[in-house]
Design a protein with these regions (language model features):
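Conserved mixed alpha/beta catalytic, RNA-binding, or beta-rich assembly cores of soluble enzyme
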Residues: 135-164, 168-221, 233, 239-242, ...
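Structural signal for hydrophobic packing residues in well-ordered secondary-structure cores
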Residues: 11, 15-22, 127, 186-189, ...
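Conserved active-site and cofactor/substrate-binding residues in soluble primary-metabolism enzymes
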Residues: 2-9, 105, 118, 138, ...
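Fold-independent oxyanion-binding glycine-rich loops
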Residues: 123-126, 166-168, 202-204, 225-229, ...
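Protein-protein interaction and targeting regions used for scaffolding, dimerization, and localization
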Residues: 1-45
Length: 293
């Protein structure tokens, strides 16, 4: 028999085996099944729509109720099953998909029209690109010369509160959370809106951009709403950093932070209401961070 005939025969046998449904091998093997579900490749299931907390993959768990309860306590990848020593295909694909979302969020940028849409003065750190922002955090804490001049000419000085929105390490956060968060926070400070300074948006900005802006505008307090480093499945997490008397040389321990603001953590509207209460406490005490008792 010619070599090509042997190869064709082997391929045909393999394809036949793949079309069969076999039982799991003894010793914890996995089922080798390829079922025809009528999917022609044009309607592939979106893995992102699967709720991992309710997706039970372990066959015949010893304590099913405890397994279900454990899964509901966290969105982390616990209680997944395996094929030999490898993860199942859907588990691996979901991991890759969530990792891609996190990468896109870090490397993405907020649309140029966003600041103007919400009447924010758009400023930029000394970073010239996203790559420089990721590798030079020191430059992300300082404003470039053009932004300094813009702040001096366009922003109100000596306000009670300066609101700063920053893209941070997750560009998805700004559009998904910021409008609801700011609206709730201002609603909590109803009747006191005129004590807020000109809101600003910082591109390629770190938390300490608060210090550079505070040094120029001299507000009593400042709040930075910033996109945090995304995790797997949590690419929209925001934190709010509040500093009393923001200025150059301010140390990290002087900032008060509220983190994990996203739909799977503290919802934006709820966080906004909490921040309004917290801001009042900080302004009354004239202190923030470890100095707030």
């Amino acid at each position: 028999m010619a070599m090509e005939d042997n190869i064709r025969l082997i391929v045909e046998q393999v394809l036949q085996e793949l079309g069969k449904t076999s039982q799991p091998a003894a010793g914890g093997g996995c089922p080798a099944t390829v079922a025809d579900n009528g999917n022609d490749g044009n309607n592939i299931e979106d893995l992102a729509k699967v709720d991992l907390q309710r997706y039970l993959q372990v066959p015949e768990p010893k304590n099913r109720s405890l397994y279900e309860e454990m899964k509901l306590t966290t969105p982390a990848r616990i209680g997944v099953w395996r094929c030999g020593t490898r993860p199942l295909t859907d588990t691996w694909l979901r991991f890759r998909a969530d990792h891609a979302v996190a990468q896109d969020s870090v490397l993405g940028e907020v649309p140029e029209e966003f600041p103007a849409k919400y009447n924010m003065v758009s400023v930029k750190s000394m970073c010239e690109s996203k790559d420089e922002y990721l590798t030079r955090p020191d430059l992300g804490r300082k404003l470039d010369e053009e932004s300094l001049n813009l702040i001096r000419s366009k922003c109100r000085k000596g306000a009670k509160l300066q609101i700063i929105v920053a893209d941070g390490l997750s560009s998805n956060v700004v559009e998904s959370n910021i409008t609801r968060l700011v609206a709730a926070k201002l609603q909590g400070r109803e009747g006191k809106k005129n004590d807020a300074g000109t809101p600003s948006f910082g591109k390629f900005a770190r938390v300490a951009i608060m210090d550079a802006i505070g040094e120029e505008l001299k507000p009593e307090a400042a709040i930075v709403l910033l996109g945090e480093r995304p995790g797997l499945g949590t690419a929209e997490s925001m934190s709010a950093y509040i500093g009393y008397n923001p200025r150059a040389g301010m140390v990290e321990s002087e900032r008060t932070v509220v983190s994990n603001i996203h739909k799977g953590g503290t919802p934006a509207a709820e966080a906004g209401a909490h921040l309004a209460t917290l801001l009042k406490k900080i302004l009354d005490a004239k202190a923030s961070g470890v100095n707030l008792h």
